[in-house]
Amino acid sequence: MEKFLDEWSLRILRELYKNSKISYKKLSKKVGISVTSCYYKVRDLEKQGIIKAYTIEIDAKKLGFPVKTLIEVKTRTGVSTEVVKVLGKYPNIFKIYGITGDKDVVIEAYFRNIEELDLFLKRIREICLDIKDTETHIVLNEHRNPKGWF
């Protein structure tokens, strides 16, 4: 049975989602509980595996990778570890998702330009014979719920 979180824990998660570097003192003020309670709630969230990591968000455009793509891949055998293994070798790929529907995999990847994207698509089709078809979407803009999805 799933354990539902109390309102304080949800508030903590929302604040950490906005800024994972926030101090316990500032976090406790924003959430409205003592620093000690805040510390223990965060520790409990970590122990439960709800908080898996504290990370950063990188601006790919400022790194010289302005072309963000979502590439749908249809394979001959469904989601195979071989396809994921081959695709995982490319540094342009940020995430690989196994999905339901007409396609088997969605790749989130970043490129310097359209030519680099085109070369990538040609290479993966040559190297990974299990890839039957791809459909590429270039992300024009991105919108995020500032409160988080939870």
Language model features by range: what are they?
Residues M1-F150:
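A compositional/biophysical signature of low hydrophobicity enriched in polar/charged and small residues
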